[in-house]
Swiss-Prot record:
SUPFAM superfamilies: Family A G protein-coupled receptor-like. The lineage of its organism: Eukaryota, Metazoa, Chordata, Craniata, Vertebrata. The keyword Glycoprotein applies. Belongs to the G-protein coupled receptor 1 family. Residues 1-19, 71-92, 155-186, 257-268 are extracellular. GO terms for molecular function: pheromone receptor activity. This is Vomeronasal type-1 receptor 98. The gene is Vom1r98. Glycans are attached at residue 158.
Length: 314
């Protein structure tokens, strides 16, 4: 393991990383508290509130755990093998839940917006039940592929060893043989391709439905639709932003992870992976909050009243 890795990350990445974690914890806390507040106030919940609230809770737990693990980036905590395996596996587990929750949300939106004539309409009455089973199954499948962490993660005993892949000052990964590396790379590629492909298909299906609906409405009314976006259009745009950002970050993370197995001990790759791995959990709640009319409309109304009051006082 290259000791320059810790020095490089400590010098250039520490402030940025903790700033990213802090923003993510704040954003996910606001999103989760907003849904809890709406539930307590007795507002009728939307069908997507549960998946979004679950995703915010998962991201919050993942970022809190990442913040605790991050302390070991810059000051050794003296963890043993069991502690290293537990923390690293839990972090990967929450990342798996994050991916599965995003996939579940995209599929859920597709089922909600599909017309009654669609084959997917038969899943509407029991969609929460089916999606809960789907989420549990995909989480187990997704996490099982990362189960090698329970073997590969060990406590770092020798700081000068060049055969270990650096994680934190207390923990490292044992190097894998070429055959095992190819096997896990294939499984990881299949796992990511399946979930990203499923999200892409659901998003394209919703976009097609909305385009058909818009064309049909224009023909019936013989006039242009109102420029104001409908709730369905806002939902599809939010999901498109989700999908695009998730796809970009997943691609970057996969490339960096594969590059680290080739260029072991490269500090710049490791520091980049730290930031990329948590970027989706930081940005996604802000995308939801910015497109949440139940939050933005009262804030806009409050701002307009304040501006009007200032104008009258002036």
């Amino acid at each position: 393991m290259n000791k320059d890795t810790t020095m490089y990350c400590s010098a250039y990445i520490r402030d940025v990383f903790f700033c990213e974690i802090g923003v993510g914890i704040s954003a996910n806390s606001c999103l989760l508290l907003f849904h809890i507040f709406m539930f307590i106030r007795g507002h009728r919940p939307r069908l997507t509130d549960l998946p979004i609230g679950l995703m915010a809770l998962i991201h919050l737990l993942m970022l809190l755990l990442a913040a605790y693990i991050a302390k070991d980036f810059f000051m050794s905590s003296g963890w043993d093998d069991i502690t290293c395996k537990l923390f690293i596996f839990l972090h990967r587990f929450f990342r798996s839940l994050s991916v599965c929750a995003t996939c579940m949300l995209s599929v859920f939106q597709t089922i909600i917006l599909c017309p009654q004539s669609s084959h997917l309409a038969k899943f509407k009455p029991n969609s929460p039940y089916h999606l809960s089973c789907f989420f549990i199954f995909m989480s187990i499948f997704y996490t099982s592929i990362s189960s090698h962490i329970l073997i590969a993660a060990i406590a770092t005993q020798n700081l000068t060893s060049v055969n270990l892949i650096y994680i934190t000052k207390s923990c490292s990964f044992l190097p894998m043989s070429s055959s095992m590396q190819r096997t896990f790379s294939t499984l990881l590629a299949f796992r990511n391709a399946f979930l990203i492909g499923l999200m892409g298909l659901s998003t394209c299906y919703m976009a097609t439905l909305l385009c058909r609906h818009k064309t049909r409405s224009q023909r019936l009314q013989n006039s242009k639709l109102s420029p104001k976006a409908t709730p369905e259009q806002r939902a599809i745009w939010t999901l498109l932003m989700f999908m695009s950002f998730f796809l970009v970050m997943s691609t970057f993370d996969s490339i960096i992870s594969y590059s680290r197995t080739i260029f072991q001990g490269n500090p710049s790759l490791y520091c980049a992976q730290i930031l990329v791995a948590h970027s989706y959990a930081v940005v996604s709640p802000m995308l939801v909050l910015s497109n949440e009319n139940r939050l933005t409309n009262p804030l806009i109304s409050m701002y307009e009243r304040i501006v009007r009051l200032d104008f009258l006082c002036w």
